[in-house]
C-alpha cells in the first residue's frame, strides 16, 4: 500500500541520518518507528478529513512532535 511505502521511505531516510551519528539501539528504533507511523497517520488524516491546518503548520507540528532523543541526531 501507499502508506506502507511512505512509512518505509521515511523510516529509511531518518534511519540513515541517525546512523551517521550513532548506532540505533532497540529503544531508539522504537521511537523512530513510532514517530514515522504517527507522522504518516496524521498526514493521512489531514488529507482524508480535510483538516483545518495549512501545510506549513502541519509540517511544523510534525517536527515539534518528534521525540527529543531523535532530534539530537536529525538536524531539523
What is each residue range found by the language model?
Residues 1-21, 26-41, 71:
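Amphipathic alpha-helical packing segments from all-alpha helical-bundle domains
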Amino acid at each position: 500500500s501507499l502508506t506502507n511505502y511512505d512509512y518505509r521511505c521515511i523510516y529509511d531516510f531518518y534511519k540513515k541520518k541517525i546512523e551517521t551519528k550513532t548506532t540505533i539501539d532497540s529503544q531508539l528504533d522504537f521511537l523512530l518507528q513510532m514517530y514515522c507511523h504517527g507522522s504518516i497517520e496524521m498526514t493521512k488524516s489531514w488529507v482524508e478529513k480535510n483538516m483545518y491546518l495549512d501545510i506549513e503548520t502541519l509540517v511544523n507540528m510534525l517536527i515539534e512532535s518528534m521525540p527529543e532523543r531523535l532530534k539530537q541526531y536529525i538536524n531539523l
